[in-house]
């Protein structure tokens, strides 16, 4: 066994990363000042395309080196699988989940998203973890601000998974589960009291169409 982490080439020409305990490493691995990604199933070095790991997205060069991606497309890459899994597990439409995350977190740039990985503004605590922040509410006299407690998550994936659970476990949202029409789902979200903003449904619809998010729905339906 090796007594240190090393990058090795097999007799068949495949590259692997071996840990100091002799076990093959997977996921994002740092080696000689660069990041690489080793597939969790095959253990092989990825040498093309892009990859998502945790709360980060990367482009992959032909030599396997990773470059961190930023911006809106990177955010979509990071949340896509969790949104699709939310349909499979809870019946929450992926396009709507993504639009809510985009709208409510400002593409993951809100203070709540960056400090607590909370993409949906869900209040309360998650496994005992929470943060207190200033939030805008809408009432009969318009918008006003209050301090409230919000759930704190270890990652975006848990935030999206909890969003699906939140909707599925609250009976008032049962009418939107497993519905395949995004405009119906966004309408019901507002009618059921998810948000107080009178333009909430139309704002979600605009985000969905602008970013082609219905393609995620079809991918979920066919997977």
Label every PLM stretch briefly:
Residues 68-223:
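Catalytic cores of secreted/periplasmic lytic hydrolases that degrade extracellular macromolecules
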Residues 1-74:
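Extracellular adhesion/carbohydrate-binding repeat motifs centered on closely spaced tryptophans
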């Amino acid at each position: 066994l090796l007594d240190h982490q090393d990058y090795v080439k097999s007799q068949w020409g495949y590259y692997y990363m071996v840990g100091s305990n002799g076990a093959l490493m997977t996921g994002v691995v740092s080696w000689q000042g660069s990041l690489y990604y080793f597939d969790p199933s095959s253990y092989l070095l990825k040498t093309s395309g892009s990859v998502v790991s945790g709360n980060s997205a990367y482009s992959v060069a032909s030599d396997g080196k990773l470059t961190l991606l930023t911006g809106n497309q990177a955010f979509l890459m990071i949340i896509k699988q969790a949104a699709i899994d939310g349909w499979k597990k809870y019946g929450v439409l992926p396009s709507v989940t993504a639009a809510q995350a985009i709208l409510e977190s400002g593409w993951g740039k809100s203070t709540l998203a960056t400090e607590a990985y909370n993409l949906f503004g869900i209040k309360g605590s998650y496994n005992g973890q929470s943060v207190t922040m200033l939030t805008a509410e809408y009432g009969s006299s318009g918008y006003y601000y209050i301090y409230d407690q919000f759930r704190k998550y270890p990652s975006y994936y848990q935030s999206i998974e909890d969003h699906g659970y939140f909707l599925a476990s609250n009976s008032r949202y049962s009418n939107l589960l497993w519905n395949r029409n995004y405009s119906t789902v966004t309408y019901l979200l507002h009618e059921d009291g998810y948000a107080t903003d009178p333009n909430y449904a139309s704002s979600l619809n605009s985000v969905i169409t602008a970013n082609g998010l219905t393609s995620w729905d079809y991918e979920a339906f066919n997977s």
